[in-house]
């Protein structure tokens, strides 16, 4: 199952998302495109389980996890109701 993590420029480098990820998908790397000069990309998206704990932990709404598999998206949407 593969998920994409959308990157915004509001990262403050607090590492809350990295610590919240149960599968250690995220890691901090240098990046000039945000205030903190470092960013938490998802180099191992195949390990992402789509729990969105990183989104919940982020104080600046930096991360957005999107599911790109049709089956997985429909299943996730069904869980919301």
From Swiss-Prot:
Main location, first listed in the record: plastid
Binding site for [4Fe-4S] cluster 2: 21, 48, 51, 54
Membrane topology: Peripheral membrane protein
Reported cofactor(s): [4Fe-4S] cluster
Catalytic activity line of the entry: reduced [plastocyanin] + hnu + oxidized [2Fe-2S]-[ferredoxin] = oxidized [plastocyanin] + reduced [2Fe-2S]-[ferredoxin]
Localization terms from the record: Plastid, Chloroplast thylakoid membrane
Residues annotated for [4Fe-4S] cluster 1 binding in this entry: 11, 14, 17, 58
Residue ranges of every copy of the 4Fe-4S ferredoxin-type domain listed in the record: 2-31, 39-68
Signal peptide: none
Any one Gene Ontology cellular component term annotated for this protein: chloroplast thylakoid membrane
Cross-referenced Gene3D superfamilies: 3.30.70.20
One Pfam family matching this protein: Fer4_21
GO biological process: photosynthetic electron transport in photosystem I
UniProt-listed Enzyme Commission number(s): 1.97.1.12
Molecular function per GO: 4 iron, 4 sulfur cluster binding; electron transfer activity; metal ion binding; oxidoreductase activity
UniProt xrefs under PANTHER family: PHOTOSYSTEM I IRON-SULFUR CENTER, PHOTOSYSTEM I IRON-SULFUR CENTER-RELATED
Subunit structure as annotated in this protein's UniProt entry: The eukaryotic PSI reaction center is composed of at least 11 subunits.
Name under which the protein is recorded: Photosystem I iron-sulfur center
Organism: Illicium oligandrum (Star anise)
Gene: psaC
